[in-house]
Amino acid sequence: MSVLSGLNTKVVKNGDPAPAPPASGTIRIYNMRYCPWAQRALIFASLKKIPTEVINIHLDQKPDWFFTKHYKGQVPALEHDEGKKIVIESAVIPEYLDDIYPEPRIIPTDHYEKVQQKLLLDRISGQLSSAFYGVVQAAKISDLLKEKLVELAKAYDTAEELLTGDFYSGTSKPGFVDYLIYPNIQRAFWTSHIIKDFPLKVESFPGPNYPKLSKWYKRLDSIPEVIATSQPTETAVEFFKSWIIGAPNFDYGL
């Protein structure tokens, strides 16, 4: 049974009333079902089996009250202790959850190893996400799109090179880097169904040019905490089509 209550519920938007504080003993994550950054927090909550209430936010029509949860009005935002504590930012929330719910521990407790994981995340995630969103923004401009597709392939070349074992954690289990980069890579998988000449291939994603990443993606894609926080591929592809043309349907599939 999933610990994530409300994951597949319709968005709240401007004009909707603010929810009551989260119940004692639970956390609340403000989310958007297709957002890779919010999925980072959901994965950690699912993995640690934390009773979690999920509230989905309409990112184009944000409720005024949501800016009291995140000053930029972004997801994810974490609320707990009956609303007394709020934590924001997609790389900060997982670390916070790892500290207050330490079983199972994901981030190394050794200070040096912890720093190395954060540096690796910064190197891989920054390049992958920048290249991917560059492609999406250029999707309707053919000359620019070709340039951005080359940049995306280079970003995946780097990710392939930096994967030296089964996982970026350097252990036999996925870790901080694996869980935090997976959502953006999953969005690239969805987009590979849509954009012509996409350098990442649907079959054995991201394709034969990335043999280590293909095995890594297959491993991550089959673990319970990823399955529990992901949307069906067919649904996600249709959402991304609406997003790419600038008319995102945040409730698609509900």
UniProtKB/Swiss-Prot annotation:
SS bond list: none
Gene3D superfamilies cross-referenced by the UniProt entry: 1.20.1050.10, Glutaredoxin
Any GO MF annotation of the entry: glutathione transferase activity
PROSITE patterns per record: GST_CTER (PS50405), GST_NTER (PS50404)
EC numbers for this chain: 2.5.1.18, 1.8.5.1, 1.20.4.2
Keywords, comma-separated and alphabetical: Oxidoreductase, Repeat, Transferase
InterPro entries (alphabetical): Glutathione-S-Trfase_C-like (IPR010987), Glutathione-S-Trfase_C_sf (IPR036282), Glutathione_S-Trfase (IPR040079), Glutathione_S-Trfase_N (IPR004045), GST_C (IPR004046), GST_omega (IPR005442), GST_Omega/HSP26 (IPR050983), Thioredoxin-like_sf (IPR036249)
Gene Ontology annotations for the cellular component aspect, listed alphabetically: cytoplasm
Domain GST C-terminal positions: 110-239
Family: Belongs to the GST superfamily. Omega family.
Function description: Exhibits glutathione-dependent thiol transferase activity. Has dehydroascorbate reductase activity and may contribute to the recycling of ascorbic acid. Participates in the biotransformation of inorganic arsenic and reduces monomethylarsonic acid (MMA).
Protein name per its UniProtKB record: Probable glutathione transferase omega-2
